[in-house]
């Protein structure tokens, strides 16, 4: 449901405590094919308040990014690149939540202030922006993009910057500073394939295809397909593509020649539109199942719209914009009032729910009297269950390194639904998903 890319990097405007390190070649998970990141800088910077000094109200201990009146949080996102639709919508969702929270007094008698920066889903640019932002924020309420999160993994660990990745790759579950809001790409795919079996669209012995991006995003989705195919007696044929590809005709044609009965997608929205159009035009007409970032409602206005409506299913662990839970309804009402002329998508409720999850940790840190970065990490480990009023399933963070939920809903493109998606199967975790153990599970903490 949430499609788009971002990037991140860090450069020296951080502080004298920042250290330059080599960054490896980062393969864009949802974005630019391959980017060489020259260097990254860890930012263990000083704040206006020294660590251990009273933060004012309630004598709360503070350090980086927190003053007597303000909690500064970073949002490093994509507002101009391939995942700009997603980046904009999740940011708007967060802004709605924090605006309402601030009207009610904020957290710990402090207002939440967001520092929002656009990296255009460029990894090198993101690393540099991160270095500039990190000395001035308590943590990152959003860090968009699997390749960017991978590039900044060591920086975030060293800086102890509590972060919500706008990425659902299981490969970053082992970072103790990351709070993944929702389930991971591999589990989305496992639940989705089980759905196709349950709906008798595929069966044991069938061949299925998977078109996936090189990098953390695509390969995590493919990991789920491999597990499900093995357990369900399916033959899997993979087709790896780069993030810059816009036409997947050759991949769909190759899969048709393999006799596939369904095609999985861990790709960009543009690639999804191409896949659906070709699937229909060459007479294949098999169902397509995608991870949450594969779709944007704007695609319904393209020539691929009818094929998407007929063939595509999207797996995600939160309500679409058209969701009917109390939380989803509240978000929709607030968004339509604030942005009456915008085209909404599933990123809006996720952004709102993620902000609520981050706030739950802030509130726990306040209760503990410690709004430092160390205090946030401690509070996170004590926040074992988060309720977002039905936007997401209950989120359980009591098992470091494991996904907070394994529940997924299935939605289909629908022009008549607000946000362009309708739910066809409510949130549930399949037995198959509950059996699954990813390589990083249990390693966080």
What are these regions (language model features)?
Residues 55-95, 117-123, 144-147, 213-219, ...:
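Extracytoplasmic "Venus flytrap"
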Residues 79, 178-240, 262:
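An alpha-beta-alpha
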Residues 156-158, 225-317:
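Extracellular/periplasmic bilobed ligand-binding domains
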